[in-house]
Amino acid sequence: MITEKDVEHIGSLACIDLSPEETGLFAKQFNSILDYFRELDEVNTDGVEPTHHVIGLTNVFREDVAGESLTQEECIANAARKEKGFIKGPRIV
């Protein structure tokens, strides 16, 4: 069972300030989720074949084939900022 103290600890680990109301609400929600998992644990799955994909899709990959592409000049033609033949992006600090 998840207590309000557990929720406060989780909140501190995530660096999230929780109000007392939120702490109580989240404790109830966590316990509700865990109760649902307990119900799932009780489901009889004898005779049910394990599956990895519910809808049975297989990998649908295509060959990686190089096609026609733009020249460098065509690529940078509409760029707002360019420098020495390259697109110049904003400085990120």
Swiss-Prot record:
Keywords, sorted A to Z: ATP-binding, Ligase, Nucleotide-binding, Protein biosynthesis
Q: Spell out the SUPFAM superfamilies in the cross-references.
A: Glu-tRNAGln amidotransferase C subunit
For this protein, what reaction is catalysed? Answer: L-glutamyl-tRNA(Gln) + L-glutamine + ATP + H2O = L-glutaminyl-tRNA(Gln) + L-glutamate + ADP + phosphate + H(+); L-aspartyl-tRNA(Asn) + L-glutamine + ATP + H2O = L-asparaginyl-tRNA(Asn) + L-glutamate + ADP + phosphate + 2 H(+)
EC number(s) stated in the UniProt entry for this protein? 6.3.5.-
Q: Name one GO biological process term.
A: translation
Which GO MF terms does the UniProt record name?
Answer: asparaginyl-tRNA synthase (glutamine-hydrolyzing) activity; ATP binding; glutaminyl-tRNA synthase (glutamine-hydrolyzing) activity
Q: Which InterPro entries match?
A: Asp/Glu-ADT_sf_sub_c, GatC
Note one Pfam family from the annotation: GatC
Q: Where are the transmembrane segments?
A: none
Calcium as UniProt keyword: no
Instruction: Show the coiled coil region(s).
Output: none
Output the superkingdom of the source species.
Archaea
Spell out the NCBIfam families in the cross-references: gatC (TIGR00135)
Report the protein's function. Allows the formation of correctly charged Asn-tRNA(Asn) or Gln-tRNA(Gln) through the transamidation of misacylated Asp-tRNA(Asn) or Glu-tRNA(Gln) in organisms which lack either or both of asparaginyl-tRNA or glutaminyl-tRNA synthetases. The reaction takes place in the presence of glutamine and ATP through an activated phospho-Asp-tRNA(Asn) or phospho-Glu-tRNA(Gln).
Q: Which proteins does it associate with, and in what oligomeric form?
A: Heterotrimer of A, B and C subunits.
Would you identify the family this protein belongs to, as annotated?
A: Belongs to the GatC family.
Protein name per the record: Aspartyl/glutamyl-tRNA(Asn/Gln) amidotransferase subunit C
Which species is this record about? Answer: Methanocella arvoryzae (strain DSM 22066 / NBRC 105507 / MRE50)
Q: Which gene encodes it?
A: gatC
